[in-house]
Amino acid sequence: MAAAAAAVGPGAGGAGSAVPGGAGPCATVSVFPGARLLTIGDANGEIQRHAEQQALRLEVRAGPDSAGIALYSHEDVCVFKCSVSRETECSRVGKQSFIITLGCNSVLIQFATPNDFCSFYNILKTCRGHTLERSVFSERTEESSAVQYFQFYGYLSQQQNMMQDYVRTGTYQRAILQNHTDFKDKIVLDVGCGSGILSFFAAQAGARKIYAVEASTMAQHAEVLVKSNNLTDRIVVIPGKVEEVSLPEQVDIIISEPMGYMLFNERMLESYLHAKKYLKPSGNMFPTIGDVHLAPFTDEQLYMEQFTKANFWYQPSFHGVDLSALRGAAVDEYFRQPVVDTFDIRILMAKSVKYTVNFLEAKEGDLHRIEIPFKFHMLHSGLVHGLAFWFDVAFIGSIMTVWLSTAPTEPLTHWYQVRCLFQSPLFAKAGDTLSGTCLLIANKRQSYDISIVAQVDQTGSKSSNLLDLKNPFFRYTGTTPSPPPGSHYTSPSENMWNTGSTYNLSSGMAVAGMPTAYDLSSVIASGSSVGHNNLIPLANTGIVNHTHSRMGSIMSTGIVQGSSGAQGSGGGSTSAHYAVNSQFTMGGPAISMASPMSIPTNTMHYGS
C-alpha cells in the first residue's frame, strides 16, 4: 500500500508553481497568478474598503513554522506583504478566498480558481503546524510511528516493490478499466497515491479530474510522473494527509490501496473512510468491500520453530551466565509475533469464516475495536496450533465486480497470509466445533493488538494468546510450501517409477545400476497422487493454475458461519516468489527485491 498521509513540499494544484526560496534551507516559493486583493478596515467607526483593480501575482514563501505572503503588480511592485504563523488571525472565506487580520485592518485575498486556493491553503496549514488544531490522524498516531511510516513509503524502491506485485497492480487496473463508466468524465480522489499509479489508471478510464493525495515525499515524484506523462490538466497531486488537506470540490469515486496485513494493519483504512467527507452521496469506492478470512490450522513444524528459538534462553551457562530465568519471557515474545508467510492449504482444519467491512457504510470508529466471533466445524482430527488469516477485497462497479484475493489458493501477493499461534495447542476431532473470539484493538503505532480466545466445545479445553501485529515474524523463504505430513494416500516412490516412460538424468550424476542421465521434470510436473476426496473442500487443494481465468475474476473464498462461498479450480503452476529479509520493520505490506522476483508466465490470461 502507499502512504495516505505527511506533508512535504509546496502545493501542486491549479496554476501554482514552486521554485526554491531563500528564507531558509527548507523554504520554497509557490506562485499563484491572477489573485485579487481587498483591504477592509473600520477606522473611526466606519467600514472602509480598498480593492486593487488589477490582478496580482501572489507568492508564498514556505518555512518550517510560518509562511511569507507577498502580492506583486504586473510592474513587480509589492503591494502587500506579511508573515503568517500559528498566532496570526486568518481564515478561509468561501471556496477560493482567504482573509488575514493585521491590527485594525483585514485583507481578503481571492484566488483565480478553487484549485489555486486549495493548494495555497494546504501549504499554509503545513507551515503553521497542526498543534493547535490536531487532525484525526495526529490524534490516533504517535509522532515517531508516523515519521517512520512516511519515510518508509517515500522510497522509490518501496513503491517499486508494491508496483511489481503483478496481482495487486494488474487487478486494480483491470477493475478500473473494466468499469470505465464509473470513471468517464468523473471527479476522482486517490487516497495515498504513492507514485500515482492508480491515478494514471483512472485517467486511462477517462476521468476528467483526479486529486491525488500523498503525504510522504513520494508526492514530489508523483508530480514528476504527472508532468512527464502530460496529464497536469487532469491529475492534481496534493501533498499532505487526507485528514488535513482541502479539496476544491466533491468527488464521484474514491480509489485507494489501503490494505495492510490481515487487511487492517497500518490503519490506513481509517484514512480511506475519512476521505468519504469529499464523496458525493451517490459516489462509489474502489475497493468497495473487504473480507477478512480466518481458519484453524495445524503446523507442528512452525510451532516447534518458535519454541526452539526461545530455548536459547534456557541455557544454564551461556559464557558462564545462567539465562534460564528469561526463557518464559522469550516464549511469550516469540508467540506474540504473527507469522507472515504462505502455506499449503491442506494444513487448514475447517472452512474459513469471514468478517466483512463495507467501506461505503463503515465509519472510522468501527475500526477502533474489531470483534470477530467464530465457530468452526472441524473437518479433521489433530492439534490446532492457531488461526490463519487472509483477506479479499471487491471492486463493485457498474459493469462488473472484480476481486483481489490474498487466499492461500491464489497466486502469492506481497501481503502473503498471516498466522497467529497458540502457546498451548488444542486437540480437536473431526466433527467437533471450535468456537471463540478474535478481538483487534487499534493502537497509536498504526497497528492492532490482537486477542484470541478459542475452545473445543465438546471437551471444554481452551487456549488463548495476545499478539502484536506491529511486530510480525517474516518467515517466507521463496520456496513452495511443503504439504503437511500424511498428505500422501498412495506411494510417491511407486508413482515416480510407474509413469511408464524412460527418464534422462540431465544432472549427469552416476549411480550404480541407474542411467547416467535422468530427467525428472515429468515426475515433478505430475505431482503426488493425493486423494482430493480426503482433503478440505475449501477451493483448490493444489497449487493453482490460472490459465483458465482472468486476473481479478475470482470470487471471495470462505464461508459465513457455515455457508460455503468458495470457488475452486485445479491444475499446477509456479507462483510468484517475494523474498523477505530483515528490512521489514514496518509491519506493513512490503516485499524485498533483494533477489529478482519470479513472475509466473501463466497468471494473467484474458480469456473467459
Curated annotation (Swiss-Prot):
Q: What is the effect of changing residue 227 to A?
A: Loss of FBXO9-mediated ubiquitination and subsequent proteasomal degradation
**Name of the molecule in the record:** Histone-arginine methyltransferase CARM1
Task: State where it is primarily located.
Answer: nucleus
Key word Manganese present in the record? Answer: no
Mod. after translation:
Auto-methylated on Arg-550. Methylation enhances transcription coactivator activity. Methylation is required for its role in the regulation of pre-mRNA alternative splicing.
The record places domain SAM-dependent MTase PRMT-type at 146-453
Q: Where is this cross-link: Glycyl lysine isopeptide (Lys-Gly) (interchain with G-Cter in ubiquitin)?
A: 227
EC number(s) stated in the UniProt entry for this protein: 2.1.1.319
Where does this one sit in the cell? Nucleus; Cytoplasm; Chromosome
- Summarize the activity regulation: Methylation of H3R17 (H3R17me) by CARM1 is stimulated by preacetylation of H3 'Lys-18' (H3K18ac) H3 'Lys-23' (H3K23ac) by EP300 and blocked by citrullination of H3 'Arg-17' (H3R17ci) by PADI4.
What processes does the entry annotate via GO biological process terms? chromatin remodeling; methylation; negative regulation of dendrite development; positive regulation of cell population proliferation; positive regulation of epithelial cell apoptotic process; positive regulation of fat cell differentiation; positive regulation of transcription by RNA polymerase I; regulation of DNA-templated transcription
Q: Which family does it belong to?
A: Belongs to the class I-like SAM-binding methyltransferase superfamily. Protein arginine N-methyltransferase family.
Q: Which GO terms describe its molecular function?
A: beta-catenin binding; DNA-binding transcription factor binding; histone arginine N-methyltransferase activity; histone H3R17 methyltransferase activity; histone H3R2 methyltransferase activity; histone methyltransferase activity; protein methyltransferase activity; protein-arginine N-methyltransferase activity
Q: Tell me the segments the record calls region Transactivation domain.
A: 499-608
Q: Which domain of life is it from?
A: Eukaryota
What changing residue 168 to A does, per the record, is: Loss of protein methyltransferase activity without affecting ability to regulate replication fork progression
Q: Where is this region: Required for nuclear translocation?
A: 346-379
Q: What does this protein do?
A: Methylates (mono- and asymmetric dimethylation) the guanidino nitrogens of arginyl residues in several proteins involved in DNA packaging, transcription regulation, pre-mRNA splicing, and mRNA stability. Recruited to promoters upon gene activation together with histone acetyltransferases from EP300/P300 and p160 families, methylates histone H3 at 'Arg-17' (H3R17me), forming mainly asymmetric dimethylarginine (H3R17me2a), leading to activation of transcription via chromatin remodeling.
Modification sites for N-acetylalanine = 2
**InterPro entries assigned:** Arg_MeTrfase, Histone-Arg_MeTrfase_N, PH-like_dom_sf, PRMT_dom, SAM-dependent_MTases_sf
